[in-house]
Amino acid sequence: MKRQIRLKEWEPGTKRVMAPPASLIELSDGSLPPDSVKVTISDDGFVYDPNRPDVFGQRIIVMGDSVVECSYVPEGKRFTDIAEQELRARGISARVENGGRSGATILQLTLALQAKILPMRPNKIVLMNGIIDADAIQFASGLWSKGDYINPIEEEKVGHPAPKKLPELDFTARTKFLRLFADTCRLFEIDLVIATTPLRDNDEYMERYLAKNGQRNIRVEAVNQNTREFCSNNGVKLIDLDKLVNRDPRYFYDYFHFNPAGAEYAGRLLAKGLLA
């Protein structure tokens, strides 16, 4: 049986037009546009806007999951696009790369950092993940669980037993991978910023969501707190986007994915945080 370590990225050079599936629209609050959007992937496996400027002075790579990816937000209006536009408007010649990939865990992002990102020699990395970590930390197998998203190894799915659920959340491995990620950046002289994942709250949509997914809400909030504590304890710069966005439901189409208004708002907040 052939196995290989999973590199969590879009296939380089991909060009795709896609619309949100009906199932996703049904689960959203109505602010997810049903229109088709273009997804263009660079030769480095990043989601990007083909109309962005070619010239830049510094390279910032934002690594994360589907929240960073913003695949159903139009080109030029994604979270990272707005951050780059805002930095350029303030006189900073920056390229802000979208290294988001749906389902990425901190283990997978650490592998991508070491195998792919380091030789690019970026000036800065922004790490923003946690949604899938929140699913992994409830199992004894944790970040090595055999699920489609979590498994760091690509292998056949035959014969994998259901993961054993823990009586309480275990952040041990996640905290160590955050430390490994941060230490790797320090060793290779790359500035690291870590951001929390903005979450939604305080509206009828969330009342319905929590009625079905309350435990996930608790897990994701706990992961954000784990991120805050790690940054505080290890001297890593934190941009607390969860607190800055302030759970405002206008900026999400579900619990944590940005609609176009949210991508714009959070992108401006990210740029402001990078300049602080």
Label every PLM stretch briefly.
Residues 47-121:
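Membrane-embedded segments
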Residues 34, 237, 252-276:
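Histidine-centered active-site loop/cap adjacent to the catalytic His
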Residues 129-228, 246-249:
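Serine-dependent acyl-ester chemistry module
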Residues 106, 110, 171, 175, ...:
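Short, amphipathic alpha-helical "lid/cap" segments that border enzyme active or binding sites
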Residues 1-61, 74, 120-123:
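N-terminal secretory targeting modules
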Residues 98-102, 130, 196-198, 240-243:
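Residue-level recognition of beta-strand->loop/alpha-helix junctions
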Residues 58, 92-94, 121-125, 186-192, ...:
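Loop/turn elements at helix/coil->beta-strand transitions in domains of secreted/extracellular proteins
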